[in-house]
Every structure is written in structure tokens, then in C-alpha cells.
From Swiss-Prot:
Protein name: S-adenosylmethionine:tRNA ribosyltransferase-isomerase
Protein source organism: Geobacillus kaustophilus (strain HTA426)
Keyword Chloroplast set for record: no
Pathway(s) it belongs to: tRNA modification; tRNA-queuosine biosynthesis
Family to which the UniProt record says this protein belongs: Belongs to the QueA family.
PANTHER family: S-ADENOSYLMETHIONINE:TRNA RIBOSYLTRANSFERASE-ISOMERASE
Amino acid sequence: MKVDLFDFHLPEELIAQTPLPDRAASRLMVLDKRTGAIRHETFRNIISYLNPGDCLVLNDTRVMPARLYGEKEETGGTVEVLLLKQLDGDRWETLVKPGKRVKPGTKLTFGEGKLEAVCLDTLEHGGRVLEFSYDGLFYEVLAELGEMPLPPYIKEKLDDPERYQTVYAREIGSAAAPTAGLHFTEELLDAIREKGVHIVFITLHVGLGTFRPVQVDDVEKHDMHAEFYQMSEETAETLNRVREQGGRIIAVGTTSTRTLETIAGKHNGRFVAESGWTDIFIYPGYEFKGIDGLVTNFHLPKSTLIMLVSALAGRENILHAYQVAVKERYRFFSFGDAMLII
């Protein structure tokens, strides 16, 4: 299957650079995955499409202020470090710019010595393994010294970093936000609960691989990045009960989808409490075992994410919906509008 099958024309001005003042005021395209029929709504009206007994699955990961600016201890040369993944303890997989002169043994310092690091290893894709040292708690030091790493297609500085967090973000560890969840407010979640819809949480820490372009011609040859996930006993029990009682499981975001499909795929369609790493790659031909519907944003051409939504709703339905979205001037990507596939 050729990657070019997932291409579409997107005018640059439709890439949302800032979030709307009101999270739930985003537009919502509702796509019937069986017929391809489209309806246009406001996100707040998503509640009309949820039934008592359904279950929304949200990713409660929290984005780290993962970009650090520091200098090499020996020369004073400036460096930019992006935290990608915690390996164990204080060892992290990172991207360092400029990276060529940061070799094993190189020492780095940040915030006038409040945070220090030594390079332990060089990785295949150009990454570096750094081991950090500091006083106190790492995430408190990071909160003081780090910056929020916005996606590469967002050029404007964000006035309020909390707008790149969901209102329910709890478990710190992501390099990017699970953006489908950015549209929900506390009031909307309360109203959904009052309707009799279950709301449960999983955690998947989003890596920057989510923005990595597919660099092969054939979809099947793409090397998918791995991300850490976990599901609690309470969430697993609720999901199994919803499934047994005929309710729909609706994932909020591709990250929730990847978690649910990873677990259901391992356990014959059932959910169990577990944690681990997933590199599941979902594209057309995949048979879904965990979800019935999906809330998601509008994705980049030729990305693994547009392949995932095409697996759920059909490639032709998705590409037609995206053509309509461009014509109707929907806002695209992380700060853009949303789609509900049911």
C-alpha cells in the first residue's frame, strides 16, 4: 500500500496556530463510518451523539516542559535539549542541537547549574542518552527551566502553556499533547457524565515520533515508534462491563485508540490492567478489537494518524471528509477542529 494514497492538498492558512478562547467552541465534523455521511456541529454538541451506557476513553497524560536550553561545561557552547523518553531513573533519550559535538562524556549544564547532565551514549537516529543530576525533584526543576515543545508546524508562541494541556492532564511524561482531548471542558465532561455516559482514563505518553514523517514509499515498511501506556483495573472493568452491556467504546484520540487496541488485541477483545510499550501501527486492513468510535483532530497528509482514521472509516470516506473540511475551512492539526467517527 503506497503512502501517497493518503495525501491531500492542505492550504497552509488552515493550520491552526493558536487555540480558540473557548475549548468547546471548536467545530465538529461527524462522520458516519459506514455510509460516509457528514454532519457539521459545534464540539459542545458532541453530547447529542453519545448514548447512555457508552464509554468515552480519555488519555490523562500531561505534557512535560521538555525543551531545555543550556551550555557545554567545557566550552560554554549553547545547546538545545529535547527530552524524548525516560529510560530509567535519571537517564533519558534526548535530541540535542547541535548534536555533533555532544559525544559520550560531554557534560552539559542548565539554569546556572541547577540541572546538569552527562552524555552516556549516541543513538542510531542521532539521539543522545543523557544522565541528569540535580537537587530536589526532577519534574520541579524541569518546570522551572523547561519550555513546552510545540509541534513543528506551530510557529506562534503560546501565551498560556495550559492551553496545550487537556483539563484532565495528570500523569506527566508526554513530549506532545493528546490533542483530541483539548476540546473538552470540565462543564462538558460533567454534562456527558450526567447523561449516563461512562468516562474512563488510560495513560499513553506521547513521543515526538508522532510528528515523524513516514519516510518510505510503502506503508507496510514504516518503522513505528514505541510509546509507554498503562491501564488501571478500574478502567479495564468498566470497559468490559460496557462491552458486555452493548455500549459503545469511543476513544478520544489516536493515543487512546492505540492503547485500547494494543490491550484488546492481546486479550481476545477483553481489557486487562497492564502497562508496557506499544508500537502498534494501524492502517487500512486492520480489524479493530477495542473501539467502536473515535474523537480525533484533522491530521497531516501521509501521516500514520491519517492512516489510522482511514482504517476505521475507510480511506475514501476520510479523504472525502478532508476535502469537505478544506472547502468548509475547518482548522487543522493540534489547535484545530475535531472529527467524531461513529
